[in-house]
Amino acid sequence: MKFVDEAVIRVEAGDGGSGCVSFRREKYVPDGGPDGGDGGDGGSVYLQADESFNTLIDFQFERFHRAERGKNGRGRDCTGHGGEDLVLKVPVGTRAIDEETEESLGDLTAHGQRMLVAKGGFHGLGNTRFKSSTNRAPRQKTLGTPGEVRSLKLELMLLADVGLLGMPNAGKSTFIRSVSRAKPKVADYPFTTLVPNLGVVNPRHGQSFVIADIPGLIEGAADGAGLGVRFLKHLERCRVLLHLVDIDPIDGSDPIESARAIVGELEKHSPKLASKPRWLVINKKDLLLEEELQERIDHIVKELEWKGEVFTISAYNREGTEELSLKLVDFIDSLPEEEEVDVEAEVEFKWDNYHKDSDSLNEDFDDSDDDDFDDDDYDVEVIYQR
């Protein structure tokens, strides 16, 4: 299935049902009191994370989604049925953004997590609500309020513990194949990887982490060059980044300049992403002799002024990959647990705008009929006996 990580949709919550103007009609009580019921609340629109989904492709073909409208109230104090909520299932890791305000509404990072994105309209009031000691035959009702309408931008960001960074052909896909069961395409030309790949690494029994491989970055990626820039967002949730450097590039490029270019693109794209823990992984050690290898490693570390962790591996021969995986799982376990944010917060209803300009009179009733109303229906009945 085609991997789609962005989609724009329009969601419309259901309008609230209108109240009813009705009067009780019974035998011997031709002019009974008001019995118009309230309308039903409109259905709301929710997003729900589902681990059985892994792409947003369905939303590219179906962009408009509307919840059910609340039913109108009826006579005999019958309240209208509330509109059914609409639940849209999205992949775990989806972020919802209001396209008009560019406000982030929340992230769905766990299976079954649900987020309210459009609140249904509030119900209208029937004429029973307006009866009083001075108004025995109210003819007024209120309409239901409109449901919320939003244009949403959905962004799928993969959930991974470790993210791979590097130039094209740095060996990222080979590395993920060597440490997990993921099988991304590997070839000797740039941009072999066109979409992100995930793999699960199990260095020890009962301990594992998820690793993400994205298309390679090139200089100018933050300005739109290459493929990797549109996938950098998938690394935002990673807890540590592995910066893979090809120690002997086939095109003769300078690995130091390539590494600097990657760091520069990270800082341009997102300072937050650039501040994440980042380890330097020098790949393809099997292509050089031991003396030349160590000399190049020292030169790269010195020129980059690297202060963090440095590992030397051969992803193709799986040399050093097991040690690196063990270090990663220990580091991830030592990090504090990330706080979970409850996105299913109640939306505060705007009472100031409630029923604004929605009061209306039922045209089926004429105020001139007030004289026919039986006031005794609500008074004490007096029975005279001989």
Curated annotation (Swiss-Prot):
Cite a GO CC annotation: cytoplasm
Q: Where in the cell is it found?
A: Cytoplasm
Locate the Obg domain: which residues?
1-159
Specify the superkingdom: Bacteria
Which cofactor does the UniProt annotation name?
Mg(2+)
What keywords sit in the KW lines? Cytoplasm, GTP-binding, Hydrolase, Magnesium, Metal-binding, Nucleotide-binding
| Record-annotated OBG-type G domain positions | 160-333
Listed binding positions for GTP are: 166-173, 191-195, 213-216, 283-286, 314-316
Subunit info here reads: Monomer.
**Function statement:** An essential GTPase which binds GTP, GDP and possibly (p)ppGpp with moderate affinity, with high nucleotide exchange rates and a fairly low GTP hydrolysis rate. Plays a role in control of the cell cycle, stress response, ribosome biogenesis and in those bacteria that undergo differentiation, in morphogenesis control.
Query: Which family is it part of?
Result: Belongs to the TRAFAC class OBG-HflX-like GTPase superfamily. OBG GTPase family.
This one is known as GTPase Obg
Instruction: Give the gene name.
Output: obg
